[in-house]
Amino acid sequence: MQPIGTALRPHATRVMLLGAGELGKEVAIESQRLGLEVIAVDRYADAPAMQVAHRSHVMDMRDGDSLRALIERERPDYIVPEIEAIATQTLLQLESDGQRVVPCARAVQLTMNREGIRRLAAETLALPTSPYRFADSIEAFRQAVTEIGYPCFAKPVMSSSGKGQSILRNDDDVAPAWQYARQGARGDADSVIVEGEVRFDFEITLLTVQASDGIHFCAPIGHRQQEGDYRESWQPQAMSPAALARAQAIAASVVRALGGYGLFGVELFVRGDEVIFSEVSPRPHDTGLVTLVSQDLSEFALHVRAFLGLPIGVIRQFGPCASAVLLPSLHSDDVTFANLSQALRPATQLRLFGKPHIDGVRRLGVALAWGESTETARQRARDSAASVVIRP
């Protein structure tokens, strides 16, 4: 790797975050711990990572010309995408011109579109997945649902945090599911994926790091989803040695195919010793927030080390830990958090994200906890999150 310069000096090593949410905020903090100069970009002002960055910009990152102009002006050494709504074709062009995109522009483009990553996993790598079809019209959507059968799931090919996702149980659900998926889409893609139901015992996120010293795995993270978005996560998730080995093999094949240095959040379904591929993100994963207390190197620290070309070595896991989200339904531009003394019980921590607006349901923070067992840690995290009083 190249030497790291000093932030705000002529030879500074600059990192530009495309997306400045709570995950980007932690990447910014870890970057600054290594002396990097951080530039945060998002579509709204005062986003969480902007509050800790050296400087920030507000723009629509789907506008390729504007994105290119900003990057050429700031001249970052590393471009680090955190969200899906980005002009990925521009990133491909910039990378061909010599810019470094994390982990690489191809990985960002493929994974920000469910069609790209699903075809890579199922058709190129021949990994087990749920049955699926893609549709770009209501007629094609109806046909896809008929072929997959009920129950099935509809998702925009580009979305985040569960937006636009729904379950279909009968013909009455088809039209509303199509409309909901189209409304929840991000970026320029209009297609919808229809997925068949997968019966599983549990689902995991296997944080997988591709670095200068090889591929590394964090302990598997279990999580509970509701309405397509994570509500709590825990590490480690107990699973059989055979299932863990299969999960690691699948994750390794996916990240090798995507390429580049960085951390990948590989989502998998587990049924006994069987493992089925679900999705992958080429960046820190929201369920991985638990690693802020569960590991000596959080997923954010691992991501930064990896894309800088630094070795990872051994990742130490501290035992049963859990996270539970703070997810109020409010309308406010000036939220306050109360009862924190009660929330911060022994063996717990809080992260309040500092989001400047809430207009409905929005994740504003996370409670973190550890314990003698997974269930103890989960209960502590849930109790801590429930104790926080959030007022508009």
Swiss-Prot record:
Entry-linked Gene3D superfamilies? 3.40.50.20, ATP-grasp fold, A domain, ATP-grasp fold, B domain
Q: Which residues bind N(1)-(5-phospho-beta-D-ribosyl)glycinamide?
A: 22-23, 82, 286, 355, 362-363
In Pfam terms, one family for this protein is RS_preATP-grasp-like
Which pathway is this protein assigned to?
Purine metabolism; IMP biosynthesis via de novo pathway; N(2)-formyl-N(1)-(5-phospho-D-ribosyl)glycinamide from N(1)-(5-phospho-D-ribosyl)glycinamide (formate route): step 1/1
Q: Which reaction does it catalyse?
A: N(1)-(5-phospho-beta-D-ribosyl)glycinamide + formate + ATP = N(2)-formyl-N(1)-(5-phospho-beta-D-ribosyl)glycinamide + ADP + phosphate + H(+)
Q: Which one GO biological process term can you cite for this protein?
A: 'de novo' IMP biosynthetic process
Q: Which GO terms describe its cellular component?
A: cytosol
User: Which residues of the sequence carry a binding annotation for Mg(2+)?
Assistant: 267, 279
Binding positions (ATP): 114, 155, 160-165, 195-198, 203
EC number(s) on file: 6.3.1.21
Molecular function GO labels = ATP binding; magnesium ion binding; phosphoribosylglycinamide formyltransferase 2 activity; phosphoribosylglycinamide formyltransferase activity
Q: What keywords were assigned to this record? A: ATP-binding, Ligase, Magnesium, Metal-binding, Nucleotide-binding, Purine biosynthesis
User: Where do the ATP-grasp domain residues begin and end?
Assistant: 119-308
The record's similarity note reads: Belongs to the PurK/PurT family.
HAMAP family per the UniProt record, alphabetical:
PurT (MF_01643)
Self-association or partners: how does it assemble? Homodimer.
* Its job: Involved in the de novo purine biosynthesis. Catalyzes the transfer of formate to 5-phospho-ribosyl-glycinamide (GAR), producing 5-phospho-ribosyl-N-formylglycinamide (FGAR). Formate is provided by PurU via hydrolysis of 10-formyl-tetrahydrofolate.
Write the protein's name: Formate-dependent phosphoribosylglycinamide formyltransferase
